[in-house]
Amino acid sequence: MATKASSILHPPNETEHTMSRITQEGKKLTYNLKVIQQPERARACGAGAKSSADRRPVDPPPVVELRVFESDLNDQHKTDITFSYNANFFLFATLEWARPIAHGRVQTQTPSCPVLTGVPVAGIAYLDRPTQAGYFIFPDLSVRHEGLYRLNFNLYEEMKEPKHADKGGLVPHSQNHMAPLTPSKPRSPHQFLHFRLVVKSVPFTVYSAKKFPGLAESTSLSRIVAEQGCRVRIRRDVRMRRREPKPNKDYGAYDDRRITPDPYPGTPVERPRSASNASMDDPYRYPTGPPQVQPSPDYGYHHPSHQQPSPNLAATPQSHLSFGAAPPQYHAPPPPPTAHPAPPPAYTSPHLGYTHTRQLSAGPEYDPHRQKYTQYPPPSPHSDIYDQSKSSLPMNPSVDHPSYPPMPYEQRMSDPKLYAPPSQLHPTQQYQQPTPPPPPPAAIAPHPPHQRTPTKPSPSTFFPPTPSRLSVEVDSSNEADDAILNAIRTRRGYILDEKSGATKRSRDSSDHDLKPLRNGQRPVVSGDEAAKGEIGETSGGSDDEIMTYRRADGRLVAKQRVSVHSKGKEVNIPRDVDLLPRRPEVCAVAE
């Protein structure tokens, strides 16, 4: 830095310069020119075709102050006549190298284009602030090439009054003598521009586009000048690039970002759902639930060693965005076993796998054998099947579902969402299950008197399978151990078509036209469509689990939309299953 500072010359007229002259009247006029705002930096704009489009001015804009004083020859009684002096002033800026350059013997070619560009001329502006004086402002000066330069400001004056002319010099003509008498004759000029003095700025650096540090915030002097009507660009934000040492990069225009991502606000984590489903369920659809029926030893098996808090009267349906997440509420236990023939050899149900997030709440009926599978008291009834429109997203079997780890035995036994109430299934859709020890009559007699739909059958009423029907039998030898198997069997393992249509979901009205139609379903108004080969919707089935359609060859095909897990093993469910068109009254999802 010492070598660099020593190589730069400091002329006597740097920053401030003064000159004096004697007028025709013997008065002494003194011109004081001072650079009150020095240029500090600039960006080289180049000399190409696009140099004028992307041009950075010298920052900050140079401001030069002019003051004119009048005094006698002895330099006494000096008076500031800047505002009263009648003359025109303008300042012309030129550019020069800050370091002296030794010229070689070979004559170098002059540059084809000027290095300084922009508006190098400024007229005087008489301002009151910061002090009463004349100011020259250069807001649009640019340099084409990088280097270390300084600006030269040359003051020119155009006199208007003869008394202000130099002593012994040319006197400017008055306005009445300006009209030429003989226009065809050449004449000497009547108006003159007089060079008064020059002042130099301090050296400033012109950077390349890669190393330019950016524009700084506008100075207070620029703001003061702009407030008084001068055209100066005011920058209220700092645009200086924060330069940091880059050992392996020499590109100054890089942003100061790092590999670490910016702390943008991410997607907010879903907060836990409220324990109340008052905003989810229709308040006019279900009546207020009766008091809960507490388990007692007379109603079945009881576990006095495990006392769990009773669930809420209204269970909250699980969000359709949280797949496989266990809700904090307790749900209904599995349905009671019924008297059916003994099952054939073990049959693996294809409907094991994906755990639905659909809320299945308990019906009003109470069965003592539910205590065999869980120790939680059943919640109050409000719906046999959660509203299909609020159910989980339809699962396409072609999409591979992520495998979930198997649940422990204690978690499966205590997970209430795996059990479904008996009121959500139609009696004709019950699976075949081995007959447990029959309960005493006194245990079956007490039931809550509340019934939502008159047409809903009692859970103890079940039709035994007839030889004319196809039934899918499931090995239930490990039903107490496999809670997922029980949940899947209670959700329906096959489809039965009902001709009469008298028994429907309790949430639907008695009219078939009010039933929602989804996924290409068709309304079933009577049993005639079943005779024609049309498969109706299952009364207890889910609208988004099984879809029936007819192929081009006339075959009726059902597509299963779910896939579940059983004991940590994924069970693949066939995508397309042919239904038997010869028996439209009962169709099973056959393997």
Curated annotation (Swiss-Prot):
Main location: nucleus
Keyword annotations from UniProtKB, A to Z: Cytoplasm, Nucleus, Sporulation, Transcription, Transcription regulation
Annotated Basic and acidic residues bias: 13-22, 245-260, 494-516
Ranges of residues in domain Velvet: 26-235
Effect of a null allele: Abolishes cleistothecial formation, switches to mycelial phase faster, and shows impaired switching to the yeast phase once in mycelial phase. Attenuates virulence in mice and macrophages.
Similarity comment: Belongs to the velvet family. VeA subfamily.
Domain observations: The C-terminal PEST domain is a region rich in proline, glutamic acid, serine and threonine residues that is required for the light-dependent regulation of development and secondary metabolism.
Subunit structure: Component of the heterotrimeric velvet complex composed of LAE1, VEA1 and VEL2; VEA1 acting as a bridging protein between LAE1 and VEL2.
Function statement: Component of the velvet transcription factor complex that controls sexual/asexual developmental ratio in response to light, promoting sexual development in the darkness while stimulating asexual sporulation under illumination. The velvet complex hat acts as a global regulator for secondary metabolite gene expression. Regulates cleistothecial formation and hyphal growth. Acts as a positive regulator of virulence.
Protein's name according to its UniProt entry: Developmental and secondary metabolism regulator VEA1
